[in-house]
């Protein structure tokens, strides 16, 4: 089996905390130097690389003399602010050894949820790549809150792959890849060499939290691959402990788990809706509505809604889930949660009689709805 990275030109490489730190005790300068050397070699082969790197909080903890990751958000943000300085400095100096300039970009979910800011971020990244600069991206932990955070850099890496229409996302971790079961508990567990990104059985195989240093477990990586597939990007999950792993992947060697994007690439606007707008609520829909959305490409009408969950306003994104709780679609709602509760299970012709007005006959128009 040949690595999908060999034929990929534009890469997003995500490096986890454990691969750039000394077991959480500050940055590992030598390790960062090796990543810089490999990326420089990829550049010489004509590949474009965007690096998503963890490590700011771990470096901040070291500089502040903290041995344990704090739980308070203000202390985490303080550590990120202190550590981001060191992270940027080390990357800049290590890449400079190869004659490569770097750029620091800090993002939050809010940056990508706003369409204008999303397009500005995309334009900046593409310009940096055109100029031969290696963008180094991290979540802006200093200002992030629960409502605007990505939660982990695996997710951020996938969204960046969507943003720049990358060919592949490489998630480097301290694990060999995805196994059929937890190899620490099941001696019969085997490595999944290749699968389709978004295959339901993958989520059942993955699970467990990340290390105390970082935040991402294997499940977040599987979900990241599913997101990356929305823009046609394939994903490789591999061990960053493997010698010259990036160079070997680029040469065609199959390492780790390859998750192939086999679904059709989403239109740009729907991809943005699916991946960058935060879900504010849920509606449970009946089997008939599920069929109309998934097979018929229809709009969601109020009559197909069984229940409304959460509080949301007109124009916000809501998820459509089946009776088992599985999300099948999401989209921009024409009605608030209060209005939706009043018109659920009602034919569209009765909306005006119930509310006193009718904004739209659909709860979500098909042009504002995307399957997930």
From Swiss-Prot:
The gene is proB. It is found in: Cytoplasm. Its main location: cytoplasm. Pfam families: AA_kinase (PF00696), PUA (PF01472). Its EC number is 2.7.2.11. This is Glutamate 5-kinase. ATP binds at residues 14, 173-174. GO terms for molecular function: ATP binding; glutamate 5-kinase activity; RNA binding. It comes from the Bacteria. InterPro entries: AceGlu_kinase-like_sf, Asp/Glu/Uridylate_kinase, G5K_ProB, Glu/AcGlu_kinase, Glu_5kinase, Glu_5kinase/COase_Synthase, Glutamate_5-kinase_CS, PUA. Substrate binds at residues 54, 141, 153. Catalyzes the transfer of a phosphate group to glutamate to form L-glutamate 5-phosphate. Belongs to the glutamate 5-kinase family. It is an enzyme of class 2 (transferase). GO terms for biological process: L-proline biosynthetic process. Pathway: Amino-acid biosynthesis; L-proline biosynthesis; L-glutamate 5-semialdehyde from L-glutamate: step 1/2. The keyword Transferase applies. NCBIfam families: proB. It comes from Burkholderia thailandensis (strain ATCC 700388 / DSM 13276 / CCUG 48851 / CIP 106301 / E264). Keywords: Amino-acid biosynthesis, ATP-binding, Cytoplasm, Kinase, Nucleotide-binding, Proline biosynthesis, Transferase. One of its GO terms (cellular component) is cytosol. It catalyses: L-glutamate + ATP = L-glutamyl 5-phosphate + ADP. The keyword Cell membrane does not apply. Residues 280-358 form the PUA domain. Signal peptide: none annotated.
């Amino acid at each position: 089996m040949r690595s999908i990275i060999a034929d990929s030109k534009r890469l997003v490489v995500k490096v986890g905390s454990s691969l750039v730190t000394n077991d959480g005790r500050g940055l590992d300068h030598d390790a960062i130097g090796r990543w810089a050397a490999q990326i420089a070699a990829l550049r010489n082969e004509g590949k474009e690389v965007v690096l998503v790197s963890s490590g700011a909080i771990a470096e901040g903890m070291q500089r502040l003399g903290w041995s344990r990751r704090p739980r308070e958000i203000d202390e985490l943000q303080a550590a990120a602010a202190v550590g981001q300085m060191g992270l940027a400095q080390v990357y800049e100096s290590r890449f400079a050894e190869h004659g490569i300039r770097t750029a620091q970009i800090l993002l939050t979910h809010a940056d990508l949820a706003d369409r204008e800011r999303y397009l500005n971020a995309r334009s900046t990244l593409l310009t940096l790549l055109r100029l031969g600069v290696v963008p180094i991206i991290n979540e802006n932990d200093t200002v992030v809150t629960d409502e605007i955070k990505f939660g982990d850099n695996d997710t951020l890496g996938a969204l960046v792959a969507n943003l720049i229409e990358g060919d592949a996302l490489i998630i480097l971790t301290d694990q060999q890849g995805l196994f059929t079961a937890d190899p620490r508990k099941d001696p019969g567990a085997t490595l999944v060499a290749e699968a389709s990104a978004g295959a339901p059985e993958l989520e059942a195989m993955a699970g467990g939290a990340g290390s105390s240093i970082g935040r991402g477990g294997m499940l977040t990586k599987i979900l990241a691959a599913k997101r990356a597939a929305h823009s046609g990007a394939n994903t490789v999950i591999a061990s960053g402990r493997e010698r010259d792993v990036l160079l070997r992947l680029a040469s065609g060697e199959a390492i780790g788990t390859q998750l192939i994007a086999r679904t059709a690439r989403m239109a740009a606007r729907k991809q943005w809706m699916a991946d960058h707008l935060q879900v504010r609520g849920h509606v449970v829909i009946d089997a008939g509505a599920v069929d109309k959305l998934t097979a018929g490409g229809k709009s969601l009408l109020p009559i197909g809604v069984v229940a409304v969950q959460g509080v949301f306003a007109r124009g916000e994104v809501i998820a459509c889930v089946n009776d088992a709780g599985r999300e099948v679609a999401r989209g921009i709602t024409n009605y608030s949660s209060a209005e939706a509760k009043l018109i659920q299970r009602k034919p569209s012709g009765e909306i005006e009689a119930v509310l006193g007005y009718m904004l739209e006959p659909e709860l979500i128009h098909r042009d504002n709805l995307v399957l997930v």
